Amino acid sequence: NRTAGRRSGRASQRLGKRAEEAVRLALQAAGFRMIERVATPWTVTFHRGRPKAAFPTAKVSGDFRAVEPGTGRSVLVEVKCRSGRLRWSDLRPHQRQALDEHHRLGGISILAWVTGWEVRLLRWPVEEFGPGKTLKSSAP
């Protein structure tokens, strides 16, 4: 059962990998350095010696970490891949909390929104984006 506008399974994973690579390149073009993907820890269960299931063990603070040259400030990036609109509810509570806390502690928090047409690096907190709000893509 798919939610409207969202992909599932392998197609979603392929799209996510392409989006993450586009974000990495956009961060590099914006001048950030030491850009690293944050690895999600996984747990694998076995049945009779064979893998049965895999699931994320813990929530991570974001999708990428980087450093701002010149200042050495920490950069935390959360990536969202949505066409047309990005809803506040597309961000999970722990993702919003991590972006908020990182910003509050003096780091640079970025919401990277990937549409089919563009990568937008939005500085957190994003103006006029909050509970019940939606951002609209500038792409046609």
Question: Predicted regions span which residues?
Answer:
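Conserved catalytic cores of phosphodiester-cleaving nucleases, focusing on short active-site segments
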Residues: 62-84
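Acidic-basic catalytic patches of nuclease active cores, encompassing PD-(D/E)XK
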Residues: 1-56
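Mg2+/Mn2+-dependent nuclease catalytic core
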Residues: 82-102
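Nucleic-acid nuclease catalytic cores
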Residues: 100-129
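Short basic alpha-helical hairpin corresponding to helix-turn-helix/winged-helix-like nucleic-acid-binding
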Residues: 56-57, 70
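Short, electropositive alpha-helical surface patch
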Residues: 125-140
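Amphipathic coiled-coil/heptad-repeat helices and related helical stalk/stem segments
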Residues: 20, 60, 92-95
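Short, surface-exposed coil-to-beta transition loops
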Residues: 59-61, 107
